[in-house]
Structure formats: structure tokens, C-alpha cells
Amino acid sequence: MNVLKTKEEIIKTILNEENILIVQDLDGVCIPLVQDPLKRKIDKEYVEDVSKLRDKFSVLTCGEHEGRRGVNRLVEKALNSTTKAKENGFYLPGLAACGVEFQDRFSNSSYPGLNDNEINFLGKVPKMMRLMLTKELKKFLPNLSNETRTKLVDVAVCDTRFTPTLNFNEIFSYVKYDFNKVKDLQLIMEKIMNNLLEDSKSIGLENSFHLHLMPNLGLRNGREIMKYATQNEFGTTDIQFIINGAIKEAGLLLILNKYISEKTGVYPFGANFNVRNAPK
């Protein structure tokens, strides 16, 4: 039995295999976890090595490819260039946003399962979050300076393209762990996100999105239950605005469907398969 000793030998062995596909998650795997997602880093050597695997490598992540918080920005930082990845195919191919943002090595993107109305609405959500949160904080914490309020809102609104999120950790800390106030702030957070959900329904997107609370107390009538603050813990700190059907398990089926079609010319789950019509 031959033992592969070098990275080059391993890459060559993978390339020589006719039917092999490596599917890898990103955050916590090849991107170390950090408190501030904007400070994440990816290793240059990793980026260059996986590009050599071509169609035998794919990522599958609930992070995102594009946008200021996207992995594509980390790749560009690692290469110290905003053009090298595009020119040489160094972007990480595969599915992001839990299965609805697909790209190749050159960052050519598609959004299987999403329609233009959903994409357009998602693009407006962070601004709507900011406006509603600013209004609520003016009432709830009237003594805040404009500068402090703006900073708290900036940190709270996570403007990811397909999973816009409210994170109230910083605001909870600002009220100095007054758990009655924290609970009131949780109600504000829930109110804002429910308003967004109702706004989406009012323009015909009633089956497009749901709210994901972190942490939560399970489901009631199909919706996640808020974990309210106690003297011992904050409870729910984040609420994400999530696309229905966007889960990694379904995304894996989509990746396999594409891979098999490229090898055989046949889509086992159908040419129009996406996470929205995957088995539940």
C-alpha cells in the first residue's frame, strides 16, 4: 500500500480518480471562527490548492459568496488582489447561503430556486431593519446620543444578502445586563422581524421566508419560540430572515445533481431541481 506523503501527491491522486467529488463546509473548517465575521481570514495556500482540484471540489456553506461579508472578499484579501481570483479561477466553487447562491471558480453566479421578487425584497431588508430599529431605540432608549445609537444599529444589523439578521448582543450589553430591559428589547427585535415577514406577504411572498431565532425553544404552530431573558442568560440574541427551503442537506442534493449531470449528461433529480423542491 502506497502512503501519500506530499500535498502534490494527494492532489494528483484526486485528479486521477474518475468519479470523486469533495464537498466542504467553510466556517469552522477552513476559515477559523472569530467573534467579528468581518475579521475572518482564509489561507492563501488553501485557496490556490483547492483551485487545482477543478470540478472535483465544491463548497457547501450557509455563509455567502458575494457581498462585503462574503467569502469572495476573503479570497481576494488572501491573494492581495481584487482581480487575480477572477482571472485565474481562484474563487471557491459551489453553493452558499445554505443552497441558493451557486458560483463557479470565476464567480459567475446563479440563484437556483429564487425569483427576482424575492431577491429584490431581500436587498431592501437591511435598510428596512435599520429604519425600524432606529425608530424603536429612539423610543426605548431616548437618552442615547445619535452617535451611540448609530453605532448600536450598525452592529445589530447584519446585512448579509440572503440571510439578513438582527443581532442584539451589543445592545443587550449596553443596558448593562438589566434583564427586564433585555426582555423588552427581545420583544422589539421580534416585532421588527415579524413586520418584515408581514411586509413580504403583502407583496405576494407569503411562502418565501421564515424567521430563525438563535437560540430558541423549539416550534409552535410552525414558528420558532423566543427564549426570553432570565437572570442567568440572555436567551435569544439573533433573529435571521431565512429563505424557505434553504438548508444544507437540500443543497448537497443540488450539488450532486449538477455533478452527476456533468459526468453522465443526466440529471438524476431533474434539470430544474433546487432546494425549494427537494424532499422534506
Enumerate the predicted regions with their spans.
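A short acidic (Asp/Glu
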Residues: 34, 68-74, 105-106, 168, ...
